[in-house]
UniProtKB/Swiss-Prot annotation:
Protein name: Uncharacterized protein C14G10.04
Skewed-composition ranges (Polar residues): 367-385
Keyword annotations from UniProtKB, A to Z: Cytoplasm, Nucleus, Phosphoprotein
Modified residues (Phosphothreonine): T132, T258
Residue ranges, compositional bias (Low complexity): 120-131, 213-227, 400-409, 448-472
Organism of derivation: Schizosaccharomyces pombe (strain 972 / ATCC 24843) (Fission yeast)
Chief site of localization: cytoplasm
Cellular component aspect of the GO annotation: cytoplasm; cytosol; nucleus
GO BP, sorted A to Z: mRNA catabolic process; negative regulation of cytoplasmic translation
Biased composition range(s): Basic and acidic residues: 44-74
GO molecular function: eukaryotic initiation factor 4E binding
Subcellular locations according to the entry: Cytoplasm; Nucleus
């Protein structure tokens, strides 16, 4: 392996000056210092020439006139727009200003109205259907953007979507919910009694057993132990608490399906029918009178009654209980029901005989003519006799019917006067009785009977004077047949769907 000798620059310069070293003849020229100096000078000279040529070209270009600078294309505007090279993508920026000067501000995307003063290019997001710009002072609505924010809809559109999908908060719709509640109550009432007879004047209910209990019956049975036997009168101070607990007020159904809320005379007394108590079913509105008591309240004893009649009773037709559908077994509920009716009318039966057991075949029914809108005509029982010979009501053959009771009922049936007393505590002057031919008794109904009882005194606790007896609500019975829409109870005058 041969040894490599490395020479430094100083060694090479020393050897070049040595007489022992001879210059080869074919040595390249560029190695010599003179050649290198000459090459350097040549490059400098070429650079100067190139610079001079560049200056000449620029001077010639500045004197050149372009086609854009003709007088027809000159734009009068800010200095930025007055140069021919002030364009973007081959389109003049001043084009929009020309359109504005001509009044064409509705030129679609190219107009400043829709681009918010920004320049329009192919890469711009203004005017594109898929635009998702972060903000814009002008709202360009399109279907795609609305679909992206469908969950953020406000107002009626959002509410209707939630109601259709049963999502979101519950929005109250009183009309629809009330109609649905009416249909439910009508269906439950139809199931509770298959033999219910509904007339415009009188509502009579039979105690037919039901396989499915309604919602109101379930609610009335749920709190029997807590509020059993509490009547409405005890809430307004008409009777003591002990009397209210011992008294069971029968359920009263008014025409039109509207139960009395506060035991008003105008809603409770007119055309009232008392149904026989049943051990299987109870009235839908029993909770308003029995304090949410179920059918068990019919088993209580005979209530305590005051001696004075109540002035809140008028034109009451007392009918015997209809025949229940539980068979031909004898029952002793009739006398007890009669005692309850007397208790509601403010009378106390003079006799204290026990309840007789009456066969079901001996109990007559109430025949009602629905076509008569003013007053329901009731058939006379076969046992009715003139005032000289007082006979007991049908079904109460063993009950001693006193003369006071007969006089009291005759005074209710033969009166044709109407007087409206003021509420307790509002006035001490008794209103005058006003005669109205519209509300007189129908022909052939108890006509010719004289009132055998004198006007009773006011019951304890009433501060006003006793008006002319009997009391009447002051409006014709035809008003009962009108539909009442102000109460939250279903209208049972029409058959359920």
């Amino acid at each position: 392996m041969s040894q490599v000798i490395q020479y430094s620059e100083a060694d090479l310069l020393y050897l070049s000056k040595s007489p022992l070293i001879k210059k080869p003849e074919n040595l390249p020229e560029w190695i010599l210092p003179e050649a290198m100096k000459a090459d350097r000078e040549r490059h400098i000279r070429q650079e100067k020439e190139m610079k001079r040529h560049d200056d000449d070209g620029r001077q010639y270009q500045s004197d050149r006139k372009f086609a854009k600078s003709k007088h027809d294309d000159i734009i009068l505007g800010p200095p930025k727009l007055s140069f021919a090279s002030s364009n973007e993508n081959g389109r003049s920026v001043g084009r929009h200003d020309d359109l504005l000067s001509l009044g064409n501000v509705y030129n679609g995307v190219a107009s400043l109205r829709y681009r918010n003063g920004a320049s329009v290019s192919r890469s711009s997001s203004i005017g594109h259907s898929g635009s998702t710009a972060p903000w814009s002072s002008v709202g360009r609505h399109n279907r795609k953007k609305d679909n992206e924010h469908r969950d953020e809809m406000e107002g009626l559109e959002k509410v209707m979507k939630q109601r259709a999908g049963n999502t979101g908060p519950l929005v109250a719709n009183s009309t629809e919910e009330f109609e649905a509640w009416k249909r439910m109550m009508k269906a439950s009432s139809g199931e509770a009694g298959a033999g219910n007879v509904i007339t415009p004047g009188v509502t009579s209910t039979t105690g037919a057993p039901s396989g499915k209990a309604s919602l109101s019956r379930a609610a009335s049975n749920s709190s029997t132990s807590a509020r059993a036997g509490i009547s409405v009168d005890s809430l307004f101070g008409k009777r003591s608490a002990a009397q209210a607990m011992a008294t069971v007020v029968p359920s009263v159904s008014t025409p039109g399906g509207t139960p009395p809320r506060f035991a008003s005379p105008a809603l409770t007394v007119e055309s009232m029918v008392h149904a026989a108590p049943s051990t299987t079913t109870s009235s839908r509105f029993s909770k308003f009178f029995n304090g949410l008591a179920g059918p068990e309240t019919s088993k209580t004893s005979t209530p305590n009654m005051s001696n004075n009649p109540s002035p809140r009773v008028a034109n009451t037709v007392v009918s015997p209980a209809p025949i229940p559908t539980i068979g031909s077994a004898t029952i002793d509920k009739d006398a007890e029901g009669f005692q309850r009716v007397l208790a509601m009318l403010g009378r106390q039966a003079s006799s204290t005989t026990g309840s007789p057991k009456v066969a079901l075949s001996q109990m007559p029914q109430v025949n009602v003519n629905p076509s008569n809108q003013d007053l329901a005509s009731v058939k006379q029982p076969s046992g009715f006799s003139p005032p000289s010979a007082v006979a007991p009501p049908p079904g109460l053959g063993n009950h001693n019917f006193s003369n006071d009771d007969s006089s009291f009922f005759r005074s209710l049936m033969t009166s044709d006067t109407r007087s409206v007393p003021p509420p307790p505590g509002f006035s001490t002057n008794a209103p005058k009785a006003v005669k109205s031919p519209e509300i007189s008794a129908p022909p052939g109904l108890y006509r010719g009977l004289s009132s055998g009882a004198s006007i009773p005194s006011a019951p304890p606790g009433f501060g006003y004077q006793q008006p002319s007896f009997p009391y009447s609500p002051g409006f014709p019975p035809s008003a009962y047949n009108q539909n009442r829409t102000g109460y939250g109870f279903p209208d049972t005058s029409r058959p359920p769907h």
